[in-house]
Amino acid sequence: TGAKPKGISEIKNSPLTKAEGKRMIDELWKNSSPATFQPNENGKIYAGISSKDILQKLDIPSDLDYTDKETFLIDYIHYQKGETDFYFLRNTSPEWISRDIGFRLQNSVPEIWNPVSGEIAPVTVFEQKGKYIRLPLALPPYGSQLIAFRKGSASEQYTSAQKSGQHPPKMEFTSEGIHFLEDEDVILQKQQEETTVSNSLKSHEITGEWEVSFSDGWGAPSNETFPELISWTESENEGIRYFSGTGTYEKSFDFDLTDTENKKIYLDLGDVQKVAEVWLNGERLGISWAKPHRFDVTEIVQPGKNNLLVEVANVWSNRIKGDAVTGENFTNTNIRNTIIPSKGILADDQTRYPWKDVPLIESGLLGPVKISVVKLK
């Protein structure tokens, strides 16, 4: 594709002359225009027309299709190995999204591959519609999914999942079934049959005081009571406000454990800045560094009293700024200035600022922390 070159540059020690190059260009681009192409042994050349328009003229639809694809809300990569197609999808927004997504494939069965847990889960809601395999997919804020399509067919899957509103319900495909994550009825369709899933989402927010201890040697007190969850940077205590390191949150809470048949129970930490390691009733749940900060506690949470422990580590820059502002010397660094991070993916401003002028970065467990019971289908 592209406009016809005016000529070629002279290449040292090459038998190709400028005149010969000009003749070849004229031959390749002969009769090319937005409406025509010139066949040649290497393919077809289009001039004066965009790649998108060329694909449309050739009746080649988008590789990935969804209602508002012009917004580029979902970034993706398509890779093929043997007879298996892999799609890696990424949510570019800070909010949950759910879309009915079409993948330009035929005669394939989708699976969700989880690179964190190693789990491979079948997608039990999908349909072949024309040139696309369509399925409902939910992505967490800035989250991603790896979907593999293996050659084959499936006859027992649902063909669609619907709720009120423009987009499909927020749900997840797991090896145990579908997890419905919204408090709303969902209609599952299979050929001429409809199944209504009444999903009354039970959620218990863990509120009240938290006991927080901080790692020694970085300016914060050993222990502090937080009446509510806030960023360390909002604390009136200067040592906490400029703290960099690990803070350990401890709290007991009561939970009413009833009617758990065909349900899963999750602990959701809400917002965490930046990395958390979690224990419930002495059982290690794991580490979370990206939303959703959520753990399956179905087999661990117990009726009555439960004990929760969350270790949160933040970034180094807050303590460096604190030293620059207060004149203290908890850090040992010769870096006197830095670039202020931008919220944009591509930041043009490379200006370096003194540490005292650098804004603090939110830190700690921000919540809300919830125990949620979700329906399993």
Give the residues covered by each predicted segment.
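Residue-level detector of short, conserved catalytic/binding motifs and their immediate flanks
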Residues: 85, 265, 276, 293, ...
